[in-house]
């Protein structure tokens, strides 16, 4: 297909169908010259297994589900992001391998994308992240435990009636002048950066907040995991819901924490008793009484520097009461929450998911999960490169890895199988070379230096602005 992924016909990727047990497995596949990293990690066999698991039936045609998924991945990874570019990649791949060339018309490809199940794409994305998490070195984890960062953001999409109905624009915008807006909450691995789950809702309304979306992802977490979050998630009810699942939380304490008192003072953090707050609206009396009347937590003071380089202190609370983990470790762990912000930037800016292209909610969901699948696949390649060079995956630049893969992929595909090993070694070395620095307490002003070019803003819908009697306003 496109130069980003393929090196030969699909039969080449028929493997035993076992899940990737370790990074050594991926490295061994590279050594056998079986092709590019993505095709080795996401094999045709594994895609077909997920399709069968979801009862997806299909015919053998040019745009089969496997071909369509790879084309969709190629599309979200390219700078162009257009369907025409994806179809051109498919045509180039077929021509290079002696197959009949299909029509350049994008209709068949778009129809094939619409036939894909969102559940298939989400399963592939989460499965890739989970396989990577289980394969990572123990030293990459925090005290041997898996840590996940939860955070929220928003994405916009084309202004169509279907999108507006499910994800309406903010009410302050006039009809025809705004764009549908959705809120997303993601669960990211601190060790690998992979995205393990995502929940989406309209930007405003009941049950659309980040805390409500986070509750949908509880089942993704396992007993013994640790969640790192900002002050929004310093919530009595969320803390208890996680505690019941044997999941610890580390969060910044809210400025006005009602109902808590210090019961024990220590250099490693104060032990506080948090009294159950008043019943929230929307919670029944029976549900409210199911929560305990108090919780015991640990509060740690963290030193940080503000934008003026002055030391300021803030409080971090956690359910980790084990004294063998000192307060400094808790504070250092919370400061790494910033890496989740950088991951979201990588997904939205580097992979261009901040403004989606699809015109219906169903296709928007598929586009989002395909972005996350591509993101997790690239994170897996980064983990292999990091393991080869004895560094942590978090030290590898995501954008540098994406640039290296884009540069090397066409050369690896064009090379003979016996000549691919040196190219793959060079790819992994190049990915590991581009690293990010250790930047604790990093602070950047949310402002731009370069001024955008002046352009008048639409004050009425475009189809009205284009009418003859309105043209004089724009020229």
PLM segments and residue spans:
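Extracytoplasmic c-type cytochrome modules immediately beyond a signal peptide or single-pass transmembrane anchor
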Residues: 168
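Major-groove recognition helix of helix-turn-helix-like DNA-binding domains
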Residues: 99-118
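Extended, structured, electrostatic nucleic-acid-contact surfaces
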Residues: 91-99
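Noncatalytic carbohydrate-binding groove/subsite architecture in carbohydrate-active enzymes
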Residues: 139
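Single, function-defining residue in the core of a domain
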Residues: 1-89, 113-116, 123-131, 142-146, ...
């Amino acid at each position: 297909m496109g130069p980003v992924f393929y090196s030969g016909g699909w039969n080449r990727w028929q493997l035993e169908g076992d899940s990737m047990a370790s990074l050594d497995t991926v490295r061994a596949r590279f050594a056998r010259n079986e092709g590019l990293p993505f095709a080795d990690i996401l094999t045709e066999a594994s895609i077909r297994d997920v399709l069968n698991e979801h009862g997806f039936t299909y015919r053998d045609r040019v745009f089969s589900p496997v071909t369509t998924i790879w084309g969709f991945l190629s599309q979200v990874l390219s700078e162009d992001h257009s369907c025409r570019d994806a179809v051109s990649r498919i045509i180039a791949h077929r021509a290079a391998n002696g197959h009949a060339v299909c029509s350049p018309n994008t209709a068949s490809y778009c129809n094939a994308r619409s036939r894909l199940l969102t559940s298939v794409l989400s399963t592939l994305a989460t499965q890739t992240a989970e396989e990577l998490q289980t394969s990572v070195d123990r030293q990459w984890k925090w005290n041997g435990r898996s840590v996940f960062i939860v955070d929220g953001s928003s994405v916009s999409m084309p202004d169509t009636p279907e999108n507006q109905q499910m994800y309406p624009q903010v009410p302050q915008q006039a009809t025809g002048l705004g764009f549908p807006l959705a809120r997303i909450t993601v669960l990211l691995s601190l060790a690998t950066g992979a995205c393990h789950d995502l929940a989406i809702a309209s930007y405003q309304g009941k049950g659309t907040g980040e805390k409500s979306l986070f509750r949908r992802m509880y089942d993704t977490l396992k007993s013994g995991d640790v969640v790192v979050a900002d002050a929004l998630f310093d919530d009595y009810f969320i803390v208890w819901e996680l505690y019941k699942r044997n999941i610890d939380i580390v969060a910044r304490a809210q400025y006005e924490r009602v109902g808590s008192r210090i019961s024990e003072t220590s250099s490693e953090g104060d032990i506080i008793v948090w009294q159950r707050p008043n019943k929230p609206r929307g919670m029944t009396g029976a549900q409210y009484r199911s929560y305990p009347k108090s919780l015991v937590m640990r509060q740690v003071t963290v030193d940080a520097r503000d934008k003026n380089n002055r030391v300021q202190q803030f409080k971090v609370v956690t359910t980790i009461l084990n004294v063998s983990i000192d307060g400094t470790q808790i504070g250092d762990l919370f400061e790494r929450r910033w890496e989740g912000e950088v991951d979201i930037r990588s997904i939205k800016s580097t992979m261009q998911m901040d403004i989606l292209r699809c015109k219906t909610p169903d296709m928007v969901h598929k586009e989002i999960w395909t972005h996350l699948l591509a993101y997790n696949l690239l994170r897996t390649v980064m983990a292999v490169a990091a393991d080869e060079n004895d560094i942590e995956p978090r030290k590898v630049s995501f954008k540098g890895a994406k640039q290296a893969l884009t540069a090397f992929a066409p050369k690896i595909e064009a090379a003979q199988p016996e000549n691919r090993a040196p190219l793959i070694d060079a790819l992994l070395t190049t990915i590991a070379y581009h690293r990010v620095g250790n930047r604790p307490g990093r602070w950047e002003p949310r402002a731009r230096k370069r001024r955008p070019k002046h352009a008048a803003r639409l004050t009425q819908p475009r189809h009205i602005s284009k009418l003859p009697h309105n043209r004089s306003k724009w020229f």
